[in-house]
């Protein structure tokens, strides 16, 4: 039976291999990313068109998290045997193009199952104690930024940084399904 972290749940730690060693080193833990201000944990991959179309916005969200004193990390849980674009060597190639956060490989898919992640991109915002305060999408138009009329993740980050609870704590992620083994 698989778990699923929802707002109010405290996330368990993880330690995963990092494809972006310029940020975080070879192995990265949740504890090393989580700051007293919180952290964003993103499930993403290389090939999903929703992720590809959101890269600039994801990078801006990571930079904003940094400005707010929050950590930011992403996890690729797709099956690398069925989806070669998402294997570790291709993760490293993507990270080398410029990525302002650690990019972790969940090759066993244990973390995606534990967290209940279903899509890429899918975001979890944690407070400084590791409690999920927001889960869901970046905004309501991952394929076309000009059509976005919401910014739930960034709004939740702003609320958390001001010591407030996010107004919206849960949205449905819009993207590709995680490619399970």
Which sequence ranges carry the predicted segments?
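Chalcogenol-based redox active-site neighborhoods
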Residues: 1-170, 177-181
């Amino acid at each position: 039976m698989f778990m699923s972290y929802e707002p109010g749940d405290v996330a368990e730690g993880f330690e995963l291999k990092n494809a972006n060693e310029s940020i975080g080193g070879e192995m990265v833990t949740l504890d090393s990313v989580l700051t007293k201000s919180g952290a964003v944990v993103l499930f993403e991959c290389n090939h999903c068109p929703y992720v590809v179309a959101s890269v600039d916005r994801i990078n801006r969200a990571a930079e904003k998290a940094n400005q707010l004193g929050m950590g930011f990390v992403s996890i690729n849980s797709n099956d690398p045997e069925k989806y070669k674009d998402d294997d570790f060597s291709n993760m490293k190639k993507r990270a080398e193009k410029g990525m302002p956060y650690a990019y972790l490989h969940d090759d066993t898919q244990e973390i995606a199952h534990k967290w209940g992640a279903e899509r890429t991109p899918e975001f979890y915002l944690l407070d400084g104690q590791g409690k999920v305060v927001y889960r869901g999408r970046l905004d309501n138009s991952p394929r076309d930024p000009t059509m976005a009329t919401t910014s739930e993740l960034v709004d939740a980050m702003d609320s958390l940084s001001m010591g407030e609870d996010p107004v919206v704590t849960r949205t449905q992620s819009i993207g590709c399904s995680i490619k399970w083994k």
